[in-house]
């Protein structure tokens, strides 16, 4: 039984090596187009200054309010 698990683990590691997993440093920046533009969320009509987040249209305004 243990040898079967060892063979299965070896096959899985050969098919999906750990180097294929991206680390946090390799992740692309989320919404890079919004980061390059000078968009102030404080002036957005959907920004709620009390909650300090956007209540609607989260693809335009960041950060989104939790539902």
Swiss-Prot record:
The keyword Signal applies. Residues 21-50 form a propeptide. Expressed by the venom duct. Keywords: Cleavage on pair of basic residues, Disulfide bond, Hydroxylation, Neurotoxin, Secreted, Signal, Toxin. The modification 4-hydroxyproline is found at residue 63. It holds the Pfam family Conotoxin. One of its GO terms (molecular function) is toxin activity. Disulfide bonds join 53-65, 54-61, 58-64. Its main location: secreted. The keyword Transferase does not apply. Residues 1-20 form the signal peptide. GO terms for cellular component: extracellular region. It is found in: Secreted. The cysteine framework is III (CC-C-C-CC). Classified in the M-2 branch, since 2 residues stand between the fourth and the fifth cysteine residues. Belongs to the conotoxin M superfamily. This is Conotoxin TsMMSK-011. It comes from Conus tessulatus (Tessellate cone).
